[in-house]
């Protein structure tokens, strides 16, 4: 039995556009709820959210029966944490702050078993292989692993073409918040200069043949990103949905 099919990677390879939601609450219960909402993918954030290995595992278990594909953003691009996430059953990894082709190449190696990579071999006791029940997991896992890298500062932009040329990088995700800060517009992701830079970057990624991704909840920017060639777009955030809905209801009934 081979490794499970990565439906997210397959859909990207077939030219589909996929819409997702950013999950920062770090709870399996909310993950399970959003897994029934109809998003193509759900991002479990290990960088800016109070997640650890066990909470990420629990959210992945909660999404097991969902059609929404879990993407795991690791806190840093280190081999040890990527290995843990893959052994837990993650098939799509998002790595923040990728600045060079050399860094991207190391990340590719971290996601692959030897001889092509340096992922540690321990799948016999891992959730990814059904705790050893998927007998052909090792030889087939690499083909079902999807690596997404984040370009989110001036250095990454400067080296974008070289990063895009790295075999094994499946997509490049734009980080608007860090990118705007790096370009001197901290907290101004909707500044016209930042938006123009983002859209040009999305087009460069798309023109290279790689999948371009972004997080934005602004309808106009979502459409502009799609028009520029974005293929996986986070159009919602769990915290924002909860907070904004709560504020709206509270304000409605407290007006008097």
Swiss-Prot record:
Keyword Cell membrane among UniProt keywords: no
Transmembrane segments: none
Keyword Isomerase listed: no
Positions annotated to bind a divalent metal cation: 152, 178
Reactions catalysed: D-glyceraldehyde + pyruvate = 2-dehydro-3-deoxy-L-galactonate
Reported cofactor(s): a divalent metal cation
SUPFAM superfamilies: Phosphoenolpyruvate/pyruvate domain (SSF51621)
Entry keywords, A to Z: Lyase, Metal-binding, Pyruvate
Feature type site, description Increases basicity of active site His: 87
Pfam families: HpcH_HpaI
Gene Ontology cellular-component annotations: cytoplasm
Known EC number: 4.1.2.-
Membership in a protein family: Belongs to the HpcH/HpaI aldolase family.
Biological role stated in the UniProt entry: Aldolase which can catalyze in vitro the aldolisation reaction between hydroxypyruvate (HPA) or pyruvate (PA) and D-glyceraldehyde (D-GA). The condensation of pyruvate and D-glyceraldehyde produces 2-dehydro-3-deoxy-L-galactonate as the major product. Has weak activity with hydroxypyruvate and D-glyceraldehyde.
Protein name: Hydroxypyruvate/pyruvate aldolase
Organism: Roseobacter denitrificans (strain ATCC 33942 / OCh 114)
């Amino acid at each position: 039995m081979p490794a499970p099919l990565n439906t997210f990677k397959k859909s990207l390879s077939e030219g589909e556009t996929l819409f997702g939601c950013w999950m920062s609450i770090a709870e399996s219960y909310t993950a399970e709820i959003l897994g029934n909402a109809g998003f193509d993918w759900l991002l479990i954030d290990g960088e800016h959210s109070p997640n650890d290995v066990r909470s990420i595992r629990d959210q992945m278990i909660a999404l097991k029966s969902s059609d929404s594909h879990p993407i795991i953003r690791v806190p840093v691009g280190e081999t040890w944490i990527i290995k843990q996430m893959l052994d837990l059953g993650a098939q799509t990894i998002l790595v923040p702050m990728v600045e060079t082709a050399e860094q991207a190449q190391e990340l590719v190696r971290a996601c692959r078993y030897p001889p092509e990579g340096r992922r540690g071999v321990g799948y016999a006791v891992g959730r990814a292989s059904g705790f050893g029940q998927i007998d052909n997991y090792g030889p087939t896992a690499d083909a079902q692993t999807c690596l997404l890298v984040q370009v989110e500062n001036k250095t990454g932009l400067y080296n974008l073409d070289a990063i895009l040329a790295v075999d094994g990088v499946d997509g490049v995700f734009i980080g608007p918040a860090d990118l705007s800060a790096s370009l001197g517009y901290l907290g101004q992701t909707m500044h016209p200069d930042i938006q123009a830079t983002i859209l040009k970057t999305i087009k460069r990624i798309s023109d290279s043949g790689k999948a371009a991704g972004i997080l934005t909840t602004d309808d106009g920017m979502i459409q502009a990103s799609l028009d520029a060639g974005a293929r996986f777009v986070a159009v919602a955030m769990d915290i924002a949905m909860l907070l904004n809905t709560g504020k709206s209801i509270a304000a409605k009934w407290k007006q008097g």
